[in-house]
Structure formats: structure tokens, C-alpha cells
């Protein structure tokens, strides 16, 4: 009896999550018009550009290397990393730092429309002066995680580009209908 109830509850949980549109974390429904992209960056082989490419590939986006006029372009404009001291030890050395990564990008559509994208990721980092090697390794891991999170946020923001394009198409259609009515 207990096995049947457990099976029923498990089956009900699966149906509820499947029925509400639940998707596993890490996948974004990238719009069809953005399934093929070209990426430009001042540092095309840098860690941020690699993270963005990886996230796009994970979301089944084809990245085109050659420039084509009919393909949207994701342009990574710049990124900045800041370290602010949040707390200090009694001797005045930094105990905790706030790490901030700001990324500015834009999507340039084939018709020339430009949609800005921004991502900001904040993390705290405990600075232990007694373990210098471990501190450096941990700092690099945190920076990589921040770049990956910023890349995921940029990919999610592609949905806003899709919605803006749909809104622009609706406005164009309404304008054409108004012109025909006159």
C-alpha cells in the first residue's frame, strides 16, 4: 500500500512540473530568429567571449564565424571587474571583498535595430592573508563563475530582443492598416 501511494505521489509530482511548463535550469528558449548569431568582441578568445559562446552552444544557437548581412550580431562591447573592500581585519588588511562584474553588449538585427544588453554579477570573497595560493585559486574560480553567470544572463536577455522585435512588427502592421484605412 505504501509503495502505491509513493508511486502515485511521484507520478503526480512529475505531471504537475511537466504541465506547468517547468524546464530544467540552464536552458533558455532562444527565439528562432536568434538561433543563428555572429559574435563580435574586442577580445574574441578571452574568457568572457568563451563563456558566452559556450552558453549559446548549450542553448542550441549556431555561431557563425563569417559576417553575413542577414544574421543578427551579438556584440560584446566591454566588461569591467571591480573589487571593493567590505570589511577589514583588526590590523587594517581587507577581510572581505565585494567583486562586481559588469558586462555591456548589444544585439544588432539585420534591419539595423540595436538592442542593448547589460549584466551585472556581484559576489563576496573572503580574503585570508594566511593562505595566499588558495586565495588566488579561489578568486579565479569565482571570477570564472561570475563570467558564466553573466553569459547566462545575456542569453536570457535575448528573449527581450525577441519581444521588442515582435512589438515593432505589431506597430508596423498597425501603421500599415491605418494608412490603408485612410
Swiss-Prot record:
Q: Which organism is it from?
A: Photorhabdus laumondii subsp. laumondii (strain DSM 15139 / CIP 105565 / TT01)
Q: Which residues form the signal peptide?
A: 1-19
A molecular function (GO) held by this record is: lipopolysaccharide binding
Its GO CC terms are: cell outer membrane; transporter complex
What protein family is recorded? Belongs to the LptE lipoprotein family.
| UniProt keyword annotations, A-Z | Cell outer membrane, Lipoprotein, Membrane, Palmitate, Signal
Q: What interactions and quaternary structure are annotated?
A: Component of the lipopolysaccharide transport and assembly complex. Interacts with LptD.
What is the role of this chain?
Answer: Together with LptD, is involved in the assembly of lipopolysaccharide (LPS) at the surface of the outer membrane. Required for the proper assembly of LptD. Binds LPS and may serve as the LPS recognition site at the outer membrane.
Q: What is this protein called?
A: LPS-assembly lipoprotein LptE
Amino acid at each position: 500500500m505504501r509503495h502505491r501511494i509513493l508511486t502515485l505521489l511521484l507520478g503526480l509530482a512529475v505531471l504537475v512540473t511537466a504541465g506547468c511548463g517547468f524546464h530544467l535550469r540552464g536552458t533558455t528558449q532562444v527565439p528562432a530568429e536568434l538561433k543563428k548569431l555572429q559574435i563580435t568582441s574586442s577580445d574574441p578568445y578571452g574568457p568572457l567571449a568563451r563563456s558566452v559562446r559556450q552558453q549559446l552552444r548549450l542553448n542550441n544557437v549556431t555561431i557563425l564565424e563569417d559576417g553575413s548581412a542577414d544574421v543578427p550580431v551579438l556584440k560584446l562591447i566591454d566588461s569591467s571587474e571591480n573589487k571593493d573592500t567590505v570589511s577589514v581585519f583588526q590590523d587594517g588588511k581587507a577581510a572581505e571583498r565585494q567583486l562586481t562584474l559588469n558586462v555591456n553588449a548589444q544585439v544588432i538585427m539585420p534591419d539595423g535595430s540595436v538592442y542593448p544588453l547589460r549584466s551585472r554579477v556581484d559576489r563576496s570573497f573572503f580574503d585570508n592573508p594566511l593562505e595566499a595560493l588558495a586565495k588566488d585559486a579561489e578568486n579565479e574560480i569565482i571570477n570564472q563563475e561570475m563570467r558564466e553567470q553573466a553569459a547566462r544572463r545575456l542569453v536570457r536577455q535575448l528573449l527581450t530582443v525577441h519581444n521588442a522585435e515582435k512589438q515593432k512588427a505589431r506597430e508596423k502592421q498597425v501603421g500599415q492598416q491605418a494608412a490603408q484605412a485612410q
